[in-house]
């Protein structure tokens, strides 16, 4: 399996400016996370390159297209996080399942974040872990 990021024009690889589509789908537009072990996926994003410092807004999908998506509530595929940097919308004023920058957090160009999605407990108990490098 694979896990994909689909989001606004502020997240992409090799740079968000080079692939500035915003919520387009397909392998040419979306970011595929790397499987690092069974049911665990990872992506590294550098602020100012692959991730814009403001207006963070993306979500995780089970394919490079609309379909299976991870949400914060009321869905068969659920994701949560205890990150102090990023939150996941779950009826808290952010779209259900969308990753956003938490209030009061400021990203700086050059900072690098490793995002790991762990599905080992099941697709209804996915966990996003965030590590600043």
Describe the predicted segments one by one.
Residues 1-52, 63-86:
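Aromatic-rich carbohydrate-binding modules that target alpha-glucans
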Residues 38-39, 122-124:
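Beta-strand-connecting loop/turn residues
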Residues 42-44, 57, 114-116:
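Beta-strand secondary-structure signal
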Residues 50-55, 110:
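Extended extracellular/luminal ectodomain segments enriched in beta-structured repeat modules
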Residues 59-61:
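Extracellular recognition modules
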Residues 67-122:
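Structured interaction patches on ligand/partner-binding surfaces of diverse proteins
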Residues 123-133:
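Short, low-complexity, Pro/Ser/Thr/Gly-rich segments in the mature regions of secreted, periplasmic
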């Amino acid at each position: 399996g694979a896990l994909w990021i689909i989001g606004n024009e502020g997240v992409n690889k090799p740079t968000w400016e080079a692939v500035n589509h915003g919520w387009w789908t397909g392998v040419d537009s979306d970011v595929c996370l790397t499987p690092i072990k069974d049911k665990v996926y990872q992506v590294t994003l550098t602020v100012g390159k692959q991730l814009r410092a403001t207006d963070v807004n993306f979500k995780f999908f089970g394919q490079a297209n609309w379909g299976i998506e991870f949400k914060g509530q009321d869905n068969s595929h659920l994701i949560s996080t205890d990150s102090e940097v990023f939150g996941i919308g779950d009826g808290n004023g952010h779209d259900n399942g969308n990753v956003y920058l938490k209030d009061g957090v400021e990203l700086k160009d050059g900072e690098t974040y490793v995002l790991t999605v762990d599905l080992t407990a099941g697709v209804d108990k996915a966990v996003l872990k965030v590590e600043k490098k």
